[in-house]
Amino acid sequence: MIRLVFFAPYPEILPTIRQVISERPDHDDFEYEIVQDFFNNPLDNINADIAIARGFTAHTMQRKGIACAELKVTGYDVIAAIQKCLRQSPLKKLALVGAFNMVYSPENVHLIFPDIEITTYPIVEETQLETMIQKAIKEGHDAIVGGHTTVLLAEKYHIPAVMIESGRESVNNAIAEAKMAAEISFREKERSNEI
């Protein structure tokens, strides 16, 4: 049995996580808990073989040496958020603001939206988020796309913001990665106990 803690990056993803776990053929291999993640999470008392997290939380866990599979943000996730933003209001300049591991990779997004100036503001420390949002606003961006906390902070400054959502495929891939990492860890522990 694999003890798994899934840090939900935003409240709306909770049903998706539950559904994906229940539909997996190996769902009986997991004893899981879903925890609503929050800004600047200290990540104390994680009682699991492995965790799943996204953005700053995944980065912090990796830095602290906590076993973590990342809920990866795909280029498709970013494109879907930008399209949603465009449906809400016309814009000329868009800022992608968030954790480095969430907003850095979609460099080809400029090719899909040639009429919009898209600037990426990748951040390593979550505490830099508000400062980077202020910078994006000061530099004349019409809207912001980012994670849950980015959207909450953007609302404070009255700038339109859309959250990057993770789909079922990303959730399933993160669970598969977590299972594989936990099984490798179990085998390594067994080997070290034999020695």
Question: PLM features: what roles do these ranges have?
Answer:
Residues 1-195:
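Non-catalytic structural scaffold of enzyme domains
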